[in-house]
């Protein structure tokens, strides 16, 4: 009796204004969007972008070491100096940087985005195969050098397999003044190439997995099932 009562009109206006107030809903939506954007980034960068940067750094390193190996002797084969593997990985990295920095979206909305993601996936797979080949060639050449006996010759280095080998051959490395550049420096370059190409192949494999996961493993089953469960609950109540 002693309490003041508001008129019924004011109470109805207050009740009607509550559900229509867009303030808290907008704030919650922006917070959810910010959370999703932060989940897709790592230190301010998207996770696939970090993979592309690693591809670029490793590709440049493989290319530089490959050209240094080619400068040791002019008679080295192309497969023995895998600068070509680094060039291919650099091309893949440039495409990935362009795609991830300009217009990257998890769900493809245009044919250009789908084509770029597919091309990046295919080139990353190609980079993986090329890196594996480079590792195989470097390992074969390294194991061969461990069995060779090298001797200095005029403007060259002649290396021979032991006479006990059934296929005894003589390998001539031209434009070499000292055989230590073959048995020492060149062997170190081969080891470095094996490590770099192995790591580069793993990065290309992870890039392929990330592209495949974003394409085929992005499901929104919970968002779709919640309205269905809510509607079923309403039907049961009725």
Curated annotation (Swiss-Prot):
Subcellular location(s) of the protein: Cell membrane; Cell membrane, Sarcolemma; Postsynaptic cell membrane
Ranges of biased composition (kind: Low complexity): 8-20
Membrane topology classification: Multi-pass membrane protein
Location (main, coarse): membrane
Any one cellular-component term (Gene Ontology): sarcolemma
Entry keyword annotation includes Coiled coil: no
Topology, Extracellular side: 1-48, 139-188
Keyword Acetylation: no
InterPro entries per UniProt: CD20-like (IPR007237), Sarcospan (IPR030429)
Cytoplasmic compartment spans: 70-81, 103-117, 210-238
Chain positions covered by the region annotation Disordered: 1-33
Keyword terms of this UniProt record: Cell membrane, Membrane, Postsynaptic cell membrane, Synapse, Transmembrane, Transmembrane helix
Residues that span the membrane, as ranges: 49-69, 82-102, 118-138, 189-209
PANTHER family, per database record: SARCOSPAN
Protein purpose: Component of the dystrophin-glycoprotein complex (DGC), a complex that spans the muscle plasma membrane and forms a link between the F-actin cytoskeleton and the extracellular matrix. Preferentially associates with the sarcoglycan subcomplex of the DGC.
Protein name per the record: Sarcospan
Name of encoding gene: SSPN
């Amino acid at each position: 009796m002693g309490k003041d009562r508001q008129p019924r009109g004011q109470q109805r206006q207050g009740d009607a204004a509550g559900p229509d107030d867009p303030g808290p809903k907008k704030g919650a939506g922006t917070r959810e969007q910010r959370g999703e954007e932060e989940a897709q980034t790592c230190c301010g960068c998207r996770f696939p972008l970090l993979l592309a940067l690693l591809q670029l750094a490793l590709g440049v390193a493989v290319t530089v070491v490959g050209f240094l190996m080619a400068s040791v002797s002019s008679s080295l084969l192309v497969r023995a100096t895998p600068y070509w593997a680094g060039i291919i990985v650099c091309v893949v990295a440039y495409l990935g940087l362009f795609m991830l920095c300009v217009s990257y979206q998890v769900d493809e909305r245009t044919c250009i985005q789908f084509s770029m993601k597919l091309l990046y996936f295919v080139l990353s797979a190609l980079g993986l195969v090329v890196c594996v080949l480079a590792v195989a060639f470097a390992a074969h050449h390294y194991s061969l050098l461990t069995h060779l006996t090298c001797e200095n010759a005029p403007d060259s280095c002649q290396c021979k397999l032991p006479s006990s080998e059934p296929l005894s051959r003589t390998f001539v490395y031209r434009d070499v003044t000292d055989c230590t550049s073959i048995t020492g420096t060149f062997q170190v370059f081969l080891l470095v190439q094996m490590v770099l190409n192995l790591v580069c192949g793993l990065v290309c494999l992870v890039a392929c997995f990330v592209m495949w996961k974003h394409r085929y493993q992005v499901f929104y089953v919970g968002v779709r099932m919640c309205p269905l469960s809510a509607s079923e609950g309403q039907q049961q109540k009725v």
